[in-house]
Regions:
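Glycine- and aromatic-enriched membrane insertion/assembly motifs of diderm outer-membrane
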Residues: 48-79, 116, 121, 276-279
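Outer-membrane pore/translocation modules
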Residues: 24, 72-218, 229, 240-259
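Transmembrane beta-strand segments of Gram-negative outer membrane beta-barrel proteins
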Residues: 17-29, 66-74, 179, 227-233, ...
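Outer membrane beta-barrel transmembrane domains
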Residues: 34, 81-83, 203-309
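Feature captures outer-membrane beta-barrel proteins of Gram-negative bacteria and organelles
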Residues: 44-53, 100, 159-165, 192-202, ...
Length: 309
């Protein structure tokens, strides 16, 4: 249903707008996008987001945009290819239902700061078993078993921050390099991470780029078309992951939990196209081993579609 709404919005051809203050987007993660017959670990995720430009003042030396956003989403986690035998499980079965609110500050020097809070629910209350089994039955996929071992219900709250800064841009304007860092502290994910981001192609300044959701503009501003490839390796030091370790505050976290690998390298390679109202992004993500078990490294694909108005 959500995809149909977005396709209708994209197909709509209205009069040219002198400002775009709002954006709706849908984001989908799935290891099936890799076409390697894999259905395991972080196996599916979907989220819907709304962003609004709330303030733009480019008159000051440290001119900036302010954009706030909200996101609701759902994630599914399985053991290796859905194995139900307890002895073969290398990751907990669980689902995560969440909502997030954030605010971003984007500066003329092409640095940015994003602060947010996320509240979520793990366990049966996140409806992972019903959603996954219903989807598999609808499309005639294999039978899922193992949800009887899922993590216990628990609520999480995280505070998150992300900072990025432009390091250099080529004289042609077709290549740039930025440094990005992120941090999360809470009951779900606690980590710190940092790494470079390389972009190649037709680029906008980072305060008007799809890369950080800043293409929204008021009257008198022009945001050009973008078309670029990007590569983002980021090294994380991880303190807690509730999808693997269970509820931090629970004594009985569930029948299957594991410890986490503290160091993880996450690499993303992708392509973005953005023009007028529409933004489309597709990327692949490759993570090194996350779980202290027989679980292997994991990878998945992502697709995002946004419509600004």
């Amino acid at each position: 249903m959500g995809v149909c709404i977005f396709l209708c919005l994209i197909a709509y051809k209205g009069r040219a707008q002198t400002e775009l203050l709002h954006e709706l987007s849908i984001h989908s993660d799935n290891d099936a996008y890799l076409f390697i017959n894999q259905d395991q670990y972080y196996t599916n995720g979907i989220s819907f987001s709304y962003r609004q430009l709330v303030d733009k003042d480019f008159s000051a030396a440290s001119a900036k945009k302010k954009i706030w956003g909200i996101t609701i989403g759902h994630k599914l986690y399985n053991a290796y290819n859905g194995f139900s035998e307890l002895v073969l499980m290398d990751r907990p079965f669980t689902a995560y239902l969440y909502g997030r609110a954030s605010k971003a500050w984007l500066y003329r020097d092409e640095s940015s700061l994003n602060l947010g809070a996320e509240v979520g629910l793990y366990g049966k209350g996140a409806f992972g078993e019903a959603l996954q089994e219903g989807f598999h039955n609808l499309f005639g996929f294999y039978e899922i078993s193992g949800w009887e071992y899922q993590l216990r219900d628990h609520v999480t709250l995280d505070l998150r921050a992300k900072y990025s800064r432009l390091l250099l841009r080529s004289t042609s304007g077709k290549m740039d390099l930025q440094l990005q860092s992120s941090m999360s502290l809470g009951l779900n994910q606690s980590f710190i991470g940092a790494g470079p981001v390389l972009r190649l192609g037709k680029l906008n300044a980072l305060y008007a780029s799809a890369y950080n959701g800043s293409r929204l503009f008021q009257k008198g501003e022009v945001v050009n078309k973008e078309r670029y490839f990007y590569y983002r390796p980021m090294l994380f030091y991880r303190l807690y992951d509730a999808s693997i370790q269970g509820g931090m505050l629970l004594d009985d976290k569930g029948p299957v939990t594991f410890g986490i690998k503290p160091w993880m390298l996450s690499q993303i390679v992708g392509f973005t196209y953005a023009h007028r109202h529409v933004t489309i992004d597709a990327h692949l993500q490759f993570n090194t081993k996350e779980v202290k078990s027989n679980a292997t490294a994991h990878q998945f694909g992502s697709i995002s579609i946004g419509y600004a108005f």
